[in-house]
Structures are given as C-alpha cells and as structure tokens.
Amino acid sequence: LNELGPAAAVDQMKAWRAAGDSGKFLRKKSEFRSSLSTDGSTPHLPEVGRYHIYISHACPWAHRVMLVRSLLGLEDSISVSVVDWRMENDGSWIFNADEPGASEDHLHGYSGIQQLYLAADPDFAGIGTVPVLWDKNHDTIVNNESREIIRMLNTHHSLLKGEDDSRTSPLLPSELVDEIDAMIDANYESLNNGVYKAGFARTQDAYEDAVGMLFGRLDELESLLGEHRYLLGDTLTEADICLWPTLIRFDLVYHTHFKCDRNRIVDMPNVWGYLRDIFQIHGIAETCDWTHIKWHYKWSHTSINPFRVVSIGPELDWNEPHGREALSGGS
C-alpha cells in the first residue's frame, strides 16, 4: 500500500483510477515487490546501514514504516529521506530541503521520487509512490508496499542492527501472526482504504457504501477497544501499526476533507483513548508531522478542494491521560 495524491484534477483522476460509472475509487497497486532474505532467494541481505527509506510525513502508508523504524530502534541502521508535502502537478512527490520537516534526497540528490523510480526501472511508466525501501548496495528499489516493508523490518530487525537473528520482533509475536494478518485485512478495505473510497467517490451510492462500511468497522473497534488495550489484547502488534496512522489523520483530515463526517474519533472514547495511548509511547510523537498531514491533503487534492483553502482543523490534546493501563493490568 502506498500513497500518491495528485495535485491536478485531471491527472488526479487518472492516477486514483475512479472506476467508470460505478464512481468507486480503485487504488493503484504497488509495482516493486522484492524482499529482504537470508536464504539467497533475493539479492537483498538484511545488513546494517545497507537500506534507505523514502517517505512522506503526510502519507499514512509511509507512516507505518517510520513507526516500526522508531519502535525497533532502527534509526541508526536505516537512513531516511522525506519528501515535501507539496506535489508536482502530475502528482509526483518532490524533495525540498527548505521546507521544515522535509529533506533533500540524501542518496542521489534527485529532485523528486519519479527520478528514483526511473533509476530503478527506466521503463517505469507510472507515478512514483511512497514509501520506498532502497538497497544502497544494488542501487535499486527493493519494495514500495508498506505492509511488506514493515513485515521485512519486523522479521529481520536484529540483523539490520547487527545483532543475533534469533530475536523475535515484539511487534510480530510468532503465536499471533495469523491473527495479526486477519486483523490487518479486516481493517484495510473498510478503514485504511475506506477513507479514500469515501473521499474520492464519484457517485452518491459509492460514497454511501464506503462511509457505511467505514463507520460500521469503527463501531466494532469502539466495542473491541473497550475490552482490550490494543487490537489483539495486551500486546502492541503490527496490526496496530497498520491501523494507527489512518485513525490519527481522521479528525484532522478525513472527517471534513473526505466527508467521513458521521462522527469524529474524539466522539468514540475507546478509540480516541487507544490512539493517545500509542501516541504517548516513547518515539511515536516524533514520527507525526501535523503540518505536513493537513497541508498535503487539503492543498494537493484539487478535485476536492480546487481553491486550496486549508482549514485550521481541530485542537486535539494528544498528551491527555488515556487511562488504558487498567485494560492490561500494567503500564
């Protein structure tokens, strides 16, 4: 899963692929799907300092990668370049070291992500997306699918830090892998992709189908999170990592910009407390750039906001005590 958010309305419609008369949003598939391996099945060995990630702070898919990088202590092992929240008119991401929170392309000095994709594949004809996992040794893209990238980081995190490979990632307990995958699947179409299906719907029926599924799933999670601290119990897992970036953007962006306005997340005490609980984990707040998030969506999507007037958004207290420790019997 990846993020592109074209600025020009015509290019936006092509890139987002609104599907004919149905008016339903269809997400573009990720093109680069190799992986890290230790068995020689791919040329990408998990090694210290070998990999670089390209992300946007606005993008919920890229945010997943930054969360795992922080929680597993991979900051010194995997370097990062951050695109501007602004985009070119064709929908491509650009670098801008003068923009707070963004950077230059630290590896190649390229002006944008599109050059990176063409360097990896001269025949690439699409629009480059983020996140990107880049192999410095082979000077190419390994993968641009967020779910697969975070699974690689969780699987090989010890080797990526130069440690014993026997250590299991705390975010991917072996006994919970099947449940983690099932939870990610359950949340993807209704929530992760559901906000986009609502926002980019081109018929009333498509919109109502999307928001109906979205809020139906949120209601289920409100009930679930009244009983469990995290999605699968007492343990923060990859399932939470895949959901959290979408939900923290909800009240700031999706509620108004994508017309997901039956209610706000702050109106759902269990979900809202869950989001604050994770935000307050050491290292998580530093992965959030609210300015990039707000300005990217509301400025870039000119088919939704043609005059690029960016609303001020809600005031949310992410450091308000969440009181969810009692659900797991500990802090």
Predicted regions and their residues:
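C-terminal alpha-helical interaction module
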Residues: 1-331
